[in-house]
Amino acid sequence: MPVRPDPQQLEKCIDDALRKNDFKPLVTLLQIDICEDVKIKCSKQFLRKLDDLICRELHKKDIQTISNILISIGRCSKNIFILGQTGLQTMIKQGLVQKMVSWFENSKEIILSQRQSKDEAVMNMIEDLFDLLMVVYDVNDEGKNQVLESFIPHICALVIDSRVNFCIQQEALKKMNLMLDRIPQDANKILCNQEILTLMSNMGERILDVGDYELQVGIVEALCRMTTEKRRQELAYEWFSMDFIANAFKKIKDCEFETDCRIFLNLVNGMLGDRRRVFTFPCLSAFLGKYELQIPSDEKLEEFWIDFNLGSHTLSFYIAGDDDDHQWEAVTVPEEKVDMYNIEVRESKKLLTLTLKNIVKISKKEGKELLLYFDAALEITNVTKKLFGGNKYKEFTRKQDISVAKTSIHVLFDASGSQILVPESQPSPVKENLIHLKEKSNLQKKLTNPLEPDNSSSQRDRKNSQDEITTPSRKKMSEASMIVPDTDRYTVRSPILLINTSTPRRSRAPLQAIHSAEKAVSKTSESGVDYAVSLKSRQSDGRNRGNNRANHNKTATVQNKGHEHHESPDQTFNEIEETLSDAYAVEKVDKPVLPGVLDISKNKAHSRWACWTPVTTIKLCNNQRSCALPGDTFTQDTGVNKKCTKQKSVSDDDSEETQRVKYSKDVIKCNKSEEAEVCERNIQEQNHPKYSQKKNTANAKKNDWHIESETTYKSVLLNKTTEESLIYKKTCVLSKDVNTTICDKSPSRKSMRSHTKSRKELMSEVTSCELDEIPVRENSKGKRFTGTAESLINLINKRYNSSDDMISTRKLKEPRDGSGFSKKPELQFNKVQRKSYRKLKTVVNVTSECPLNDVYNFSLNGADEPVIKLGIQEFQATTREASMDNSIKLVDVRNRDERDLSLKTKDERILSHERKTLFSDTETECGWDDSKTDISWLRKPKSKRLMDYSRNKNTKKCKSIKSRSSTEKGQPRSTVVLSKNIAKNDYEVIVDGRTRLPRRATKTKKNYKDLSTSGSESESEKEISYLFKDKLPTKEETVHSSAQTKKLPKKQQKVFNTEALKGQPSEEQKNSSTLRNGREDSLYLSSASVSGSSSSVEVMRCTEKITERDFTQDYDYITKSLSPYPKAASPEFLNRSNRVVGHGKSPRISETSAVCVRKSCSPASGLPFSPRHTTKNNSVMNIKNTNSVINNQRTQHCNSYSDVSSNSSEKLYMEPESPDSCENHVQSKREENHAASPFSLSSEKIEKIWFDMPNDNTHVSGPSQRGSKRRMYLEEDELSNPSEAEVQEAEEREHLVSKKLCQREHFDQHTSETSLSTPEFSVPKDWQQELQGAGMFYDNINSDYKRKTDTQHKIMDDFTTKTLKLTQQHLLAMACQARGHRDENIDKFQVTLLDELEKVEKDSQTLRDLEKEFVDIEEKIVHKMRAFHQSERERFRALKTSLDKSLLVYNSVYEENVLTSEMCLMKANMKMLQDKLLKEMHEEELLNIRRGLESLFKDHEGNNA
C-alpha cells in the first residue's frame, strides 16, 4: 500500500525549492504514487510561489529542474484543493493560463538558443509543459477557451519559425491537433480573428519549405481542423498562391485524410523543383532484419511511400501496426542513428540498406538493419547521399594523401624533323612506338563513343591500373610520350602544352566559354591514323574543373606520318561573340544541315573552318581511354595575340624550332585554297545579319559534328609564346576582321551571292602578309612579339582600307537578298564571278561614297577629301564585277524584270526618306559596260544594225524605234548642257551614239559620223559631268548629300570644265549633220549621254527638264565609277538608273525614252497614254528630282500628236490627233508654206510650221535654232499643264504591268505605218537661198525665242522647285503616317499573337497534364476492374461449388438418412409409448377390478358379520 504523503507536502516542497533552493523533497515526491482520493490542500499563494519558482529556473535555464516541477504539478493537479475547491479551477481563475504563456515564451527563448541542435532535456521540458497544458485544457470549458485563445497563436508562431527544431515543432503540432480535436462548439469563433487567419496563411506557406513530411502532415491536419470544410474552400486560395495547389488542398476530405494528404503533399513536393526538400519514392518492400514491414491497411493507399526528409535529416514511412485494427504507425530513422548505408542492384531491384548503430524496435519487431527495395529506375543515390552524407556510404574511401610525380622530358628529333618528347625514365622511345601502334586498334574502338568523366579520381586511377599493358621497358604511370610530325609542327599548337603529366599545373585554369556540349568523334583515316578528339563537358556540370583538367592532362604517342593526304577533323574554334559585337552585327547559327557542297563550289575537297586548329591526336598509353585536352576548351583574346603570356618551354631547340615559318605542302594547299573563300563568307555574314547562316559540313559520312544553335562559341587560346602557325594567325585575324563567329564550310545559296572581295585580291594580301612575316618570325625570341604586332597592324590596315565599301553596302544587301531571286542561274553566275576575280590584278585604295566616320579606320576621316588612285585600264571593267553584289548581278535580265517590283520595294526601307515609287519593268538594273547589258528581250535576235553613212540631206525614212531602244543600252550616250553665259550656244547638245535603223535595210544608209565606242566614252563622260556640276551646283549638292557621296576637288572640276568648253565648237559643227533624224530621233536624245562621236541638236519635247537632273545623276554616277574599289549596286544607284534619260555612257540606261518613242509613234497614240514608263525616283525625293513632276507631264505630252495654237508662243497646248489627221495637217501646212511669200510669213506662222510637224517621222534639216524652239515649246507646254503629273503618277500604278504587251503591239503597228506616213514636208538645206532675208528673219526669231526661253526656263525652275518641295512634304507625311500606322498595327498584332501563343501553350500543357492524368487513372481503373472481375469470378465459382456440394448432392442424402433414422426412432418411440399406454390401461383395469373385489368382499364380510 503506497505511503500517503502529507497534504501540505506539495506546497512545502515548493517553498523549500523557492526559499532554500532545495529540490530533494520535490524529487522525492515524484517517486511517490499519489492516490486519487488524496487531497492536497494548498493556500491561495500556491500559484504565485509556483510561478516564481518556474520563472527563476527558466531564467537560470535549469532545464531538468523545470521538468521536475512541471511533472510534479501535472501528477498532483487533480488532487490539489484550494480553499475547499478544485485547485486547477481556482488557479485558472487566478490566471494560470496566462502564467503558462509566459513560461512558454521563456522556454521558446531557450529553444531558439539551441537552434536546430537536438537537446533531449529541452525536448522533455517542452513535452512536460504541453502535458500540463493538456491537463489544464481538460478541466472545464473555461480552461479550453483560455488555452485555445492564448496558446493557438503561440503554437502556430512556433511552427512557422524555421529556427525551431523539427521535433519540437512536431510535438507542438500534435498537442495543438489534440486541442482542436476536442474544441467546444462555442470556441470556433476564437479561430476566426484576423491574427489566426494570418498565421494560417503563413502555415500554408511553411508547408512548401518545411523539409519534413510528418511536419507537413501536421500542418495540413491543423489547417483542416481549424476550419470547416466549407470555409476551407474559400481560404485555400489565400493559403496557397498557386491555384492547382489550392485545388488539390480542397480535395482533402476529413474521412480520408491520410490518403488525400499523401496525394496532396506528393503533388506539392514534386512541383518545387530545386527547392524540393522532401523526396518521396514508392517502396516495393521493407524489412527490419528478417521481419517484413507491412504497408498500412488502407484501400486508397496505392504505394508503400518512403519519405527522404532533407530538412530534418530523417527517413520516415508509415507501417501497419501489430494491433487488431492495424492502425498507422510512423517510423522515423534519424541521420545520427544510421551507422552506414549502401545502395546496390539485386534482381532488377535497387536495395537501400541502412545499418543502424543500435538495435531498434518497431512494433514487436527488432533489428539492426533496415532493408528497403525500390524499383531499379528510381534515382535514389543522390538523395540518399544528401540525407545521410557521403561519408557513411559503404563504398566511400577517404583519400589519405596526395602523390605528385614529376618527370623530366627529352626533346628529340628524328630524321624527318619530327619532335619526339620522351620521359627520361623511358629507355627505348623508338621501340615503344611499335607498342603504341598495336594499342591503337583497341583505342580506336573506344574513341568512337563520347566519354564521360568519372565521378572520382580513385575510380579513374583504379581503371587506369587495370587497363595498363605491361611491357619490359614500360614508362611510369604518370609519364607520357608523343611524336609531333614535321608536317604538322606549325599548324598545331605548341607541343609543349601537349606534354602534360599528372603533376598539377600551377598555371591559371583556362576560362570556360562553353555554353553547350558537343560530342567528340574520333575519325580514323585509311592509314589507321587517329586525329584529334575533342571532348566538351557542360559548364552546368557539378564536377570539379580542376580534377577534370588534371585527369585530362595526359598524352599518348601518336604516329602521324601519313597526315599529308588525309583530312583531319578540324577543331572548330569559334571566336567570342562580344569582341566585335559593338562594331558589327553578329550572326546566329541555326541547326547544322548537310547538303551537297561540290555543286556550289567545286574546289572545296578539303574545306576548312575558319580559325581551324588541327590538334595532334592525344590518347592515353596507360589506360585504354581518351580524354579531352584542356587546350580544347579555352578562350581567345580579342587582340588575337596581343596579350600572350610567356611560358617557358622545356627545350630551347624546341622553342626556336617552333618559330620557323615552315609550311608543309598540305597545309599550304589547304589553307591558301580556302582562306579567301572563308573570308569572303565572313564578309558576307557581317553584311547580312537578317538571315541566319546554315552550316554545311563536308564528308558527312566520316564526321559527326554537332554544332549547337545560337550560343555555341568555342574559343581559341593562342598558345603562350611559341603559339601556332602563321596560317592559323592570319586566318584568325581575317575572320575577326569580318566579325564572324562561326564560319561555314559551305555557305548556303543565298550567302554565296554576297561575296564582296575577290579570291585573287585576298590571296595577294595573304601572300604579302606571309612574305612580311617570314623574316620577322625567323628572328630571336625577343623580336617575336614585335613581328607579331607589326603583322597584326598590317592586316588591320589592309582590312580597314579595303572594306569601306563593305560598310557602305551593308544596308544595301539586306533587302536585296530578300527578293525572290530565281536559283536557276546560280552555277553559271559563280563561273562568271570567278572569272572576274581572275581579271582583277590591282588593289586600289579608295574611300567609299558614304562619308561615315569609322572609329577603327586608320586611314580616312569622313571629312577628308577622297584620294583616288586609279589602277590599270582594265580595272574599271573588272572591279565592278568583283565588287557588285552577287545577289544583284544577274545572268539573265528576264529574271531581273520579274522581280523588279519586289526588289525596289525592299530598297525603300534603306533610304533616308521612304517613298512609294513605281519603276518601269523595262528598265535595266545594272550593267557596267556595253558588253554586260543584256537587252535581248527588247529586240529580235540577231538583227543586223544598218547605219546611214551617206550625206544625203533629204532622207525621209524614220528610224526604227525598237532598234534604237536596243542601242540605248548597248551603246551608251551622254547629254551636255553648256553654261548659260555663252550667248548663242545656250542650247542642249545631244551626242548621238550608234543607232539602229529600221529593218528595211535597202532604204537606209550609213552615216560615218554616227560613231560611238566604249573606250572614248569614259573620258567625255567625266568631262561633261563636271560641266553639269558647275551649271547646277545646288542641285548637285542635294544629290550628293542624299546619296552620301563625296565631291571631287574644285580643281579637278575646273579642269574638266575647261576641257569641255574647248571641245564644244567641234561638237556644234557636227550638229547640223544630224538634224535630219527628225523628231523621232529627238525622242531618243533624252536618254543619250556624252561620247566622243558626233552629237545632235535634236531635242525631244520632254527632254529639257530632265537633262539637268540627269546630268547631276550622271555626275554622281561618274564619281562612283571612278572609285577603284568594287561597289555593289546601291538602291540609289538603281533608282537613279530609272530616272536617267539623258545618259548614254552610263551603263544604267533606262528604257523610258525608248518606250516613250514607241508610244508616241504608235497609231493609238492619239489617245491619252498611261504613263507606265514614266519613272519616279525610288530613293530620296530630294535627290536629283527637281523636275520629276514635269517629267511625268512631259512624257505624257510627248507621246501624243499635237496641234499648236499660233496666237501665243507662250501658251501652246498639245491636242491628241489621229495619224491621218496629223498627216493632213502637216500637208496643209506645207502647202501653205510654199504658197506664201517668204517675207510675208510672220513669226507666228513660222512658229506654227516648226511646231506642227508630226512627231513620228518629220525630218527637217536646218540651223540649230530649231532645237531652241522645240525646247521652248516643251517648256510652254509643261507650264500650261502643271497639274497633270499627279494624274500621270496615279495612272502609273494602275497600268504598270499591263502595258508591256500593249507597248510591243503599238511598236509593231507603228513600224508598218511610219513607213507609209513618211513626211513629205521638208526644208532643203539651201532654204536661205530660196527665202530672201532669211538670215535677218532667223536672227529676230532666234533672239525672240531665246528671251522667251530664258524667261520660261526661270519660271519652270521656280515652279518645279516649289512643286518638288510640296510633293516631298506630302509624300513624307504620307509615308510617315502610313509607316507609323502599319507599325502600330503590327505591334498590336504581335502582342495579341504572343498572348494567344502563351495561352495556347498553357492550354496545351493543361491538356497534356489532363491526358496524363486520364492515362494514369485509366490504367488504375483497368487494373482495379480486372481485379474486381477476377474476384467476382472466384466468388461465383466458390458459391456454385458450395451450392452443389451443400444443397444439391449432400443435403438429399443426409436428409434421407436423417428421415430414415428419425422414422425408425419415431417407430420405436411410438411402440414404446403404445406399450406404455397399454400397460397403464391394463394396470388401471386391474386396479379397478381389485377395488371392486375388495368392496365386494367387504360387503360380504359385513353381511356375514
UniProtKB/Swiss-Prot annotation:
It comes from the Eukaryota. The keyword Cell cycle applies. Residues 1384-1435 form a coiled coil. It is found in: Nucleus; Chromosome. It comes from Rattus norvegicus. This is Synaptonemal complex protein 2. Residues 1222-1234 have a biased composition (Basic and acidic residues). The modification Phosphoserine is found at residues 457, 465, 494, 507, 516, 525, 534, 651, 655, 746, 920, 1121, 1123, 1130, 1146, 1150, 1162, 1165, 1170, 1188, 1218, 1221, 1237, 1280, 1283. The modification Phosphothreonine is found at residues 471, 503, 613, 638, 922, 1174, 1318. Pfam families: SYCP2_ARLD, SYCP2_SLD. One of its GO terms (biological process) is apoptotic process. One of its GO terms (cellular component) is lateral element. Phosphorylated. GO terms for molecular function: DNA binding.
